[in-house]
Amino acid sequence: GQPKAAPSVTLFPPSSEELQANKATLVCLVSDFNPGAVTVAWKADGSPVKVGVETTKPSKQSNNKYAASSYLSLTPEQWKSHRSYSCRVTHEGSTVEKTVAPAECS
C-alpha cells in the first residue's frame, strides 16, 4: 500500500472578472493526499454552508496520490455580506481549514 499523505489545501476566492459578471465561485483545491477519501465542508462566518456546494470525486494524480476540488457557488452579494468563508477538509481523522475574507480582495 501507499504511505499515507495529508492533503495540501488551497482556497481560491472569486476573481474580480467573475464578480463583475455577477458571479462568485470559491474553489477549494485538495491535492496530494492518500488514501483517496476526503470530506470537504464549507462555512460562512463559521456557520455551515450546504447550498451551492459541489465536490468532485478524488482522482489519482500521476504521482499516485489523489486530488479533488470543491466548488461553492455564491452571488456577489452573498460573498460580500460575510466576513469570511472557510473550506474545511477532513482526511483520515485530521482536519485542515483554509479561510478567505472578502474584504481583502474586493
Curated annotation (Swiss-Prot):
Other remarks in the entry: Ke+ has Gly-46 and Oz- has Arg-83.
GO biological process, alphabetically ordered: adaptive immune response; B cell receptor signaling pathway; immunoglobulin mediated immune response
Signal sequence interval, chain numbering: none
Protein name from the UniProt record: Immunoglobulin lambda constant 7
Subcellular location: Secreted; Cell membrane
Quaternary assembly: Immunoglobulins are composed of two identical heavy chains and two identical light chains; disulfide-linked.
SMART domains: IGc1 (SM00407)
Cross-referenced SUPFAM superfamilies: Immunoglobulin
Pfam families, sorted: C1-set
Entry function: Constant region of immunoglobulin light chains. Immunoglobulins, also known as antibodies, are membrane-bound or secreted glycoproteins produced by B lymphocytes. In the recognition phase of humoral immunity, the membrane-bound immunoglobulins serve as receptors which, upon binding of a specific antigen, trigger the clonal expansion and differentiation of B lymphocytes into immunoglobulins-secreting plasma cells. Secreted immunoglobulins mediate the effector phase of humoral immunity, which results in the elimination of bound antigens.
Disulfide topology: 28-87
GO molecular function: antigen binding
InterPro entries recorded: Ig-like_dom, Ig-like_dom_sf, Ig-like_fold, Ig/MHC_CS, Ig_C1-set, MHC/Immunoglobulin
Major subcellular site: secreted
Gene3D superfamilies noted in UniProt: Immunoglobulins
Highest taxon, organism lineage: Eukaryota
Keywords, sorted A to Z: Adaptive immunity, Cell membrane, Disulfide bond, Immunity, Immunoglobulin, Immunoglobulin domain, Membrane, Secreted
Entry-linked PANTHER family: IG-LIKE DOMAIN-CONTAINING PROTEIN (PTHR19944:SF98), MHC CLASS II-RELATED (PTHR19944)
Organism this protein belongs to: Homo sapiens
Ig-like domain segment(s): 7-101
